[in-house]
Design a protein with these regions (language model features):
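Thiamine diphosphate
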Residues: 46-69, 75, 79, 89-100, ...
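A structural-propensity feature for long, helix-poor, extended segments
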Residues: 105-108, 112, 488-509, 514
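Conserved internal helical-beta-strand scaffold that buttresses enzyme catalytic cores
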Residues: 2-5, 14, 20-23, 28-71, ...
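Cofactor-binding active-site loop characterized by glycine-rich and histidine/acidic residues
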Residues: 1-127, 150-151, 407-410, 417, ...
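Non-catalytic terminal/interface segments that mediate subunit docking, oligomerization
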Residues: 324-484, 489-499, 560-561, 582-603, ...
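A short, small-residue-rich loop immediately preceding and capping a beta-strand
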Residues: 12-16, 66-69, 96-114, 132-134, ...
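Generic, well-ordered alpha-helical scaffold segments in large soluble proteins
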Residues: 2, 29-32, 83-89, 120-123, ...
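Conserved short loop/turn motifs at secondary-structure junctions
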Residues: 14-15, 26, 107-110, 142, ...
Length: 766
């Protein structure tokens, strides 16, 4: 009623990261406000065929209500830090006014054990995020038992936050303790409180006033005398600070006025508050689903809820009349503060997206010059940064890898964001591409911090809703340290309907040579396929990359599709041809015919490839024809994931519409008239290409890089993982033998010709 600014405020509303398990309380408040109906409350956790309410905050399920998913636990605090930082970034770049806006994160003390909860505290202080407020509900319990039964979680968190440079406000004891504190001139209360462990405090609230008198006050004569005139009921009602509205108000008021550093409020509470014998302060509270009639009556009486005994068994919802003083006041306060919360804006700004022609410097090919797709991406980014319509919206995000990816030229051009600018003279200041930090810098240089960098990407990718300002984030990183490292955050990004680009650099298990097992990515596209609204591509050529990026901009920022893009780019240099005519649709759909051999011998095969391995496929086609007089068609497959999605959609349509003429998947339509077996080779696990097997009308064999990576040259790695041109030829020959059109002696001949050892180590298990 007093602090949280709504979306109609002067500079926009506050951003609330609400503890997932408190969702029912938020729904109850929204019911009183008239935002939710009784029918909706009755359908809590029943969402499939009714207008129900999601279990936890999920924007995908309630897209105009919840802003941020905060489960699994730990995601909320990390996101909140980078959201507050992104508001400062936008403000310092002159894109928004954020004066007075706050980012609130409501957390649990048990949740603070998550590394994500505390791992970025120093960043918040270093960036001077005085627009950030954490409220930690310290009820001393987690699901199974005490958070720190043998210790004190509040003091532990206080030390942690103070050490990180935060402003700490503790709300420990409620107002009913104040008279006792006033009489305690010698500090006996403080002494006893410091002696008690959190396990003791849990026991006090799980029992009654007599127990508290005996085990807390009677330990010292001075304390025993202090409460000798208090009844057990009065002792029992000595409240904790987190349940005292006046104490909480005072803490919030102090927090919003604080300047210079982020603030944390540590509020001591009781888990199961109000449940009494049904679960207050007990270890079973989290699993308590029902209350007995007597327990319901006790709850009603404790909080003065006007429900009669004859109605109590129905557990009715209670809401004062709309013209009651309480509801009028509640609505008046929200109106004064700028509207209701939580609220997610679905009014989306539309950007003017450049046409593909503006990328002609990339799509026309590079002649004899050899570059990587990473460098092609940097060129595309440069084109976008020169576009007057969207250049200011571009947010390059890098976790200490700009030089790795050849992006250091952007340091001077657009600068690295720093809230204090550059207070030192960089060692390379006399060079053209020196390390330039600036208050209005555009690059978010995150250091070695993939989780934080991804949270910056989320903040930018959801700015169209949070700030009504569409931003276009490009986060480029080692592909192995993406979904595998921060998969939970990527899933949350999908839930939030994030829009932006993820660039998995140095991708491909055999393409990143020399760095070994933990760096070589052979499965990021497999992980990307698990997120329903993640659109992923593995392009080979610069023109494919340009088409994909331009289409992504169109889909996300003009068409307003709730998707985000994952694109793998490589560090292998090779030549990039001109874009063939009419391939744009195939690039976007996931495959197109790159080269057709119209001679077509008796034995003919279809060869598929993607990324850098497509070049091995092209080489294999030449070897097949030169060494065995076998012709082939070559397909560039930009996305097995997109082909699978389209195939499943067609399959479902046919299942659901048996009376209609069956549709054909795009894969089927492209291959149905093409003779010969299909061999698909990628730099990823075979399951990546296996996804389209149901839609391939021909015999289908896949090659991939299953197994652990290792350091060596690309040539050695590709032979080890059996994805080089020699193994593609061998596989094609075996497929023709299986078709009955080729004698197996040709396979034996090929193994001798290419020096393939039949007893070589199996890369899947070695």
């Amino acid at each position: 009623n007093y602090f949280f600014k709504g979306p109609k405020g002067e500079n926009g509303g506050d951003l609330l990261y609400i503890q997932g398990h408190s969702a029912p309380g938020i729904y109850a408040r929204a019911f009183l406000e008239g935002r939710l109906t009784e029918k909706q409350l009755e359908k809590f956790r029943q969402e499939v065929e009714v207008d129900g309410l999601s279990s936890y905050p999920h924007p995908w399920l309630m897209n105009d209500f919840w802003q941020f998913p905060t489960v699994s636990m730990g995601l909320g605090p990390l996101q909140a830090i980078y959201q507050a930082r992104f508001l400062k970034y936008l403000e310092n770049r002159g894109l928004i006014k954020a004066e007075g806006r706050k980012v609130w994160a409501f957390l649990g003390d048990g949740e603070m054990d998550e590394p994500e909860s505390v791992g970025a505290l120093s960043i918040a202080a270093r960036e001077k995020l005085d627009n950030l407020i954490f409220v930690v509900n310290c009820n001393l319990q987690r699901l199974d038992g005490p958070v720190r039964g043998n210790g004190k979680i509040i003091q532990e968190l206080e030390g942690l936050f103070r050490g990180a440079g935060w402003n700490v406000i503790k709300v420990i004891w409620g107002g009913r303790w104040d008279p006792l504190f006033a009489r305690d001139n010698q500090g006996w209360l403080q002494k006893r409180m410091e002696e008690c462990l959190d396990g003791d405090y849990q026991s006090y609230k799980a029992n009654d006033g007599s127990y508290v008198r005996q085990h807390f006050f009677n330990q010292y004569p001075e304390l025993k005398k202090m409460v000798e005139n208090m009844t057990d009921e009065e002792i029992w009602r000595l409240n904790r600070g987190g349940h005292d509205p006046q104490k909480v108000y005072a803490a919030y008021a102090r927090a919003v006025e604080h300047k210079g550093t982020p603030t944390v409020i540590l509020a001591k509470t009781i888990k199961g508050y109000g449940m009494g014998a049904a679960g207050e302060g007990q270890n079973i509270t989290h699993q308590q689903k029902k209350m007995t009639i007597d327990q319901l009556k006790a709850f009603r009486d404790r909080f003065n809820i006007p429900v009669s005994d004859d109605k109590i068994a129905d557990i009715p919802f209670y809401k004062p009349d709309d013209d009651s003083p309480e509801i009028k006041y509640l609505k008046k306060q929200r109106e004064a503060l700028g509207g209701y919360l939580p609220h997610r804006s679905i009014e989306v700004e539309q950007l003017k997206i450049p046409h593909l022609e503006e990328f002609s410097s990339i799509t026309k090919g590079l002649g004899d010059r050899e570059i990587s797709t990473t460098m092609a991406f940097v060129r595309i980014l440069s084109v976008l940064l020169k576009n007057k319509d969207i250049s200011s919206r571009i947010v390059p995000i890098v976790p200490d890898e700009c030089r790795t990816f050849g992006m250091e030229g952007l340091f001077r051009q657009i600068g690295i964001y720093s809230p204090v600018g550059q207070l030192y003279t960089p060692v390379d200041h006399e060079q053209v591409m020196y390390y330039r930090e600036a208050v209005d810098g555009q690059i978010l240089e995150e250091g070695i911090n993939e989780a934080g960098a991804f949270c910056s990407w989320i903040a930018a990718a959801t700015s169209y809703s949070s700030n009504k300002l569409a931003m276009i984030p490009f986060y480029i990183y080692y592909s192995m340290f993406g979904f595998q490292r921060i998969g939970d955050l990527a899933w949350a990004a999908g839930d939030m309907q994030a829009r932006g680009f993820l660039l998995g650099g140095t991708a491909g298990r055999t393409t990143l040579a020399g760095e070994g097992l933990q760096h070589q990515d052979g499965h990021s596209h497999v992980l990307a396929s698990t997120i329903p609204n993640c659109i992923s591509y593995d392009p080979t050529y610069a023109y494919e990359l340009a088409v994909i990026v331009q289409n992504g901009l169109y889909r996300m920022y003009e068409k307003q599709d709730n998707v985000f893009y994952y694109i793998t780019i490589m560090n292998e240099n090779y030549s990039h041809p001109d874009m063939p005519e009419g391939v744009e649709e195939g690039i976007i759909k996931g495959m197109y015919l790159l080269k057709e051999n119209k001679k077509k011998s008796k034995n003919h095969v279809q060869l598929m490839g993607c990324g850098t391995i497509l070049r091995e496929v092209i080489k294999a086609a030449e070897m097949l024809e030169e060494d065995f007089s076998i012709t082939s068609d070559i397909w560039s497959v930009t996305s097995f994931n997109e082909l699978r999605k389209e195939g499943l959609a067609v399959e479902r349509y046919n299942n659901m519409h048996p009376k209609n003429k069956p549709q054909q998947s795009y894969v089927t339509s492209q291959l149905k008239e093409r003779p010969g077996p299909v061999i698909a080779t990628t730099d990823y696990m075979r399951i990546y290409a296996d996804q389209i097997r149901p839609f391939v009308p021909n015999r289908y064999i896949t090659l991939g890089t299953d197994g652990y990576g290792r350091s060596d040259t690309r040539t050695q790695l590709r032979h080890f993982f059996e994805v080089d041109a020699k193994f593609i030829v061998l596989t094609a020959l075996n497929a023709l033998v299986a078709e009955g059109t080729l004698d197996k002696t040709k396979v034996v001949d090929a193994m001798k010709r290419y020096n393939i050892n039949p007893d070589k180590l199996n890369p899947m298990t070695h």
